[in-house]
Amino acid sequence: MNHIHEHLKLVPVDKIDLHETFEPLRLEKTKSSIEADDFIRHPILVTAMQHGRYMVIDGVHRYTSLKALGCKKVPVQEIHETQYSISTWQHKVPFGVWWETLQQEHRLPWTTETRQEAPFITMCHGDTEQYLYTKDLGEAHFQVWEKVVASYSGCCSVERIAQGTYPCLSQQDVLMKYQPLSYKEIEAVVHKGETVPAGVTRFNISGRCLNLQVPLALLKQDDDVEQLRNWKQFLADKFANMRCYTEKVYLVEQ
């Protein structure tokens, strides 16, 4: 377990970039929970980028909450490319006016035609599937993606469903499916100072550290030297009680 020690770090909040936007309601819930606990339970998962910067691949709402709570640095676990794969979340959304609006948007060339190329966006309602293809959208496909997700995420409850699973849908449900981006595509978006829609990209990560419970007081310290000393002692105390499970486990989240 020695390698985990090297990958747990304290990183200044201004050295971290986000690849996706946050969901306001979820952010408030996460922030309130962290504030009530007075600690951050799980470290934020990041990948290293150029010039000493990091990109969050899991923990956008935790990072944004810590920043809002006045933390100078945040606890991260650096994840390497061999530890993750990228997929997407499907969105199960209640049928509503947003669907009608998307149907009538002339800049969205919906089609029921199936092609050799995978559709960029798939919208399922009843027995009908409609598609948007990257080739038809051209360079505007990222803007279209943002527009489609924004059409329902601000007004409806969204249930995230793992890619490749087939939920039971009623006539009152719409299932939105999205094609995953590659890491290089996501990194390119971040380098331009942009983000992808919230709650769509999913990093499937192995070897994550859970239940570290880093106190907010440690993260808010102004003295960098003292903070680093306290961080090292904190990790030493935690590692004395750390276990690594190699077998499959089932965790019930509270």
Curated annotation (Swiss-Prot):
Active site, UniProt feature: E20
Pathway terms, separated by semicolons: Siderophore biosynthesis
The UniProt record lists the keyword Nucleotide-binding: yes
Entry's EC annotation: 2.7.1.225
GO cellular component: chromosome
Keywords: ATP-binding, DNA-binding, Kinase, Nucleotide-binding, Transferase
Inducing or repressing factors: Up-regulated under iron-deficient growth conditions. Repressed by Fur under iron-rich growth conditions.
Activity regulation information from UniProt: Binds heme and heme binding inhibits DNA binding.
Pfam family of the protein (one): ParBc
GO BP, sorted A to Z: chromosome segregation; positive regulation of sporulation resulting in formation of a cellular spore; siderophore biosynthetic process
Transmembrane annotation, as ranges: none
Record: residues binding O-phospho-L-serine: I57, G59, H61, W98, R229
Disruption phenotype: Mutant is impaired for staphyloferrin B production.
Catalytic activity annotation: L-serine + ATP = O-phospho-L-serine + ADP + H(+)
Binding, ADP: S33, D58, G59, H61, R62
GO molecular function, one term: phosphotransferase activity, alcohol group as acceptor
Function: Free serine kinase that uses ATP to phosphorylate L-serine to yield O-phospho-L-serine and ADP. O-phospho-L-serine serves as a substrate for SbnA and is a precursor for staphyloferrin B biosynthesis. Is also a DNA-binding regulatory protein that senses heme to control gene expression for siderophore biosynthesis. Binds to DNA within the sbnC coding region and is required for expression of genes in the sbn operon from sbnD onward.
NCBIfam families: staphy_B_SbnI
Subunit structure: Forms dimers and tetramers in solution. Predominantly forms dimers. Dimerization/oligomerization is not essential for kinase activity.
Name used for this protein in its record: ATP-dependent L-serine kinase SbnI
Gene source species: Staphylococcus aureus (strain NCTC 8325 / PS 47)
